[in-house]
Regions:
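Detector for C-terminal structural segments
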Residues: 34, 208, 212, 217, ...
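N-terminal lobe/hinge region of extracytoplasmic solute-binding protein
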Residues: 42-93, 123, 197
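Aromatic- and charge-enriched surface segment that lines or borders ligand/interaction sites
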Residues: 88-131, 147, 153-155, 247, ...
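Alpha-helical secondary-structure segments
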Residues: 114-121, 151-155, 200-201, 230-232, ...
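Gly/Pro-rich hinge or "lid" segments in bacterial periplasmic/extracellular proteins
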Residues: 170-225, 232
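Ligand-site clamp/hinge motif
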Residues: 220-267
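Structural transition elements
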Residues: 334-373, 390-395
Length: 543
């Protein structure tokens, strides 16, 4: 015990003194489950899959947060992590992170939840490595041991991994029922629902894929988030944000949560029966380049790395982010000039000085020179894909303006196309789109989460982008920063990585935005869940 205590203290000091102890709030049996009036929440976010191994998107993550147990959870209103189904969670050695589970954990189907389920959950993520899944977050995990039914030891590749507690509360962290889920393939949605493989604040009572989910409070929930204040919550999925706007105005739904247009938000803010809630911003929007299929990409008929880079650089020189933020989003978004959003430790504005006029604006002559110096004939044909439903109704206007900005330079001829989200998710990882829109909502509040999933790429841990960008030096630096205990030194390392990425431009960051929800005046709890953890907790809502 003395050895354990001493090592734990040293490790936690190195990890920023994150203290995770059994003093967290927990709930059991008869205390759980609210009796508030039923609520209906609307969203345009689509669900890709209920299986956590096959989904790494905002719509699917929202569902996971309601129905699955996590080892750690964020305290509402903060980015502070606490044990959830764990009694405790700490480093016992620099590369060993030990979790003690609470006794008597069960899934809604009656199956015991033990350390075996925890090991199973992480092992299957790494084995399946679905291109739409979050396995890229587990690049720092070497193996999982289970000394007994309530003890889990995570063997980590990096000493004092600064990010591991956040990973446990992320999209890679749901603990699934090993008696229901396949160990080496995705489990179909309906099988999960029929088997009642849930142990979060809610279970799923009924399920119609991307139409309607009815949640029911789980009475035996033992996680950190308080018992659900409302016994029954419906999540209604919209293909058209205008219909969602009309429904929240009429009171057909109680909350509209992602994504309304900036014009709609402005309009709804004038309705005396509604409240517009705003929370901390962590969302980013960006263009992804497929290094194989973009103009002059590695697998095109005319591969040329120098020319491909020049095309990316010239696009960066030609985009006016402020115009997009103001004209399309009425400044509910702000320009993003790096790969990490402003406000996080380590963020810089590497792209602002490197491209365009050096002040954030476009510079067509600079773009023209970049292409000329590389021997690129103009105009360059660009096939640019965007998604009209997942990232909000203004995506069409956003990408129409991007097309207009690029076309007006005379250097590009943009062919703009759109695809709905479920198909889009499959296509983008199958080399269908040479360049395309994506957005990002963080798994945890750290610059690492805007870098590692995108740009750390190995055979064992492919990147989430699947865009064929791989740089061994950046891989090494991403690994090193995660275990750098000195805050100032780590921020310096993060800045260096962003500078290097700005030279290669595997993606083109565009905007960052706030969390916004609209609710009826009688709805409580919305403000509490719009917090730096970026998790929308239905359990906090009531009316």
């Amino acid at each position: 015990m003395n050895r354990r205590t001493g090592v734990k203290a040293a490790a936690l000091a190195a990890a920023g003194a994150l203290l995770l102890s059994a003093c967290s709030t927990s709930t059991t049996g008869s205390d759980a489950g609210g009796d508030g009036s039923a609520l209906t929440v609307g969203t345009t976010d689509k669900v890709v899959a209920l299986d956590p191994a096959g989904a790494y998107d905002n719509g699917s993550s929202l569902v996971e947060q309601q129905i699955y147990p996590f080892i750690l959870a964020y305290k509402p209103g903060t980015a502070e992590l606490n044990p959830s189904i764990a009694e405790s969670a700490d480093f016992t050695e620099p590369t060993k992170y030990e979790v003690k589970l609470k006794d008597g954990l069960k899934y809604a189907n009656g199956n015991d939840l033990t350390s075996s389920d925890v090991k199973f959950s992480f092992d299957r993520q790494l084995k399946i490595q679905d291109p739409n899944g979050p396995s890229s977050l587990l690049g720092g995990l070497a193996s999982v041991e289970t000394p007994d039914d309530t003890t889990v030891v995570f063997n980590l590749k990096r000493e004092n991994d600064q990010t591991w507690p956040g990973v446990l509360a992320s999209a890679a962290g749901p603990i699934v029922d090993e008696d229901v889920f396949s160990p080496d393939a995705l489990t179909p949605d309906q099988e999960i629902v029929d088997a009642e493989a849930f142990s979060g604040p809610y279970t799923i009572d009924s399920f119609k894929f991307n139409e309607l989910i009815t949640y029911k409070a789980y009475p035996d929930y033992q996680g950190y988030v308080e018992p659900a204040k409302t016994d029954s919550v419906q999540m209604r999925y919209y293909s058209d944000a205008n219909n969602m706007k009309l429904d929240v105005q009429k009171g057909t739904i109680d909350v509209a949560w992602r994504s309304l247009s900036a014009t709609d938000i402005e309009d709804l803010g004038k309705d005396e029966n509604l409240t517009v809630h705003k929370g901390p911003g962590g969302e980013i929007r960006y263009i992804v380049y497929n290094m194989d299929t973009m103009p002059f990409g590695a697998k095109t008929d005319d591969p040329d790395e120098k020319k491909a880079l020049a095309v990316r650089q010239a696009m960066a020189d030609s985009i006016d982010r402020q115009a997009i933020a103001s004209q399309v989003y009425k400044d509910t978004y702000t320009p993003l000039y790096s790969f990490v959003p402003d406000g996080l430790p380590g963020a810089n504005e590497a792209l602002k000085s490197a491209y365009g006029d050096g002040q954030g604006g476009a510079d067509v002559e600079k773009a023209k020179k970049a292409l000329e110096d590389a021997g690129v004939q103009t105009p360059v044909d660009l096939n640019l894909q965007y998604n009209p439903d997942h990232y909000g109704p203004s995506s069409g206007d956003e990408y129409a303006l991007i097309k207009d900005q690029l076309d007006k330079t005379g250097l590009f001829n943009v062919n703009l196309q759109s695809t709905e989200w479920v198909q889009y998710s499959e296509d983008r990882t199958s080399d269908v789109y040479p360049m395309y829109q994506l957005g990002w909502f963080p798994d945890y509040s750290d610059a690492d989460n805007y870098l590692v999933p995108f740009f750390y790429d190995t055979d064992e841990t492919p990147s989430f982008l699947a865009n064929h960008f791989r740089d061994d030096q950046i891989n090494k630096e991403l690994t090193d920063q995660a275990s750098t205990a000195d805050k100032a030194e780590r921020e310096k390392e993060l800045g260096t990585i962003q500078d290097q990425l700005s030279e290669q431009l595997p993606t083109l960051p565009l905007l960052q935005g706030n969390q916004i929800a609209v609710s009826g005046k009688d709805v409580k709890g919305v403000e509490e869940t719009l917090d730096p953890a970026f998790q929308f907790r239905l359990a906090l809502l009531s009316k």
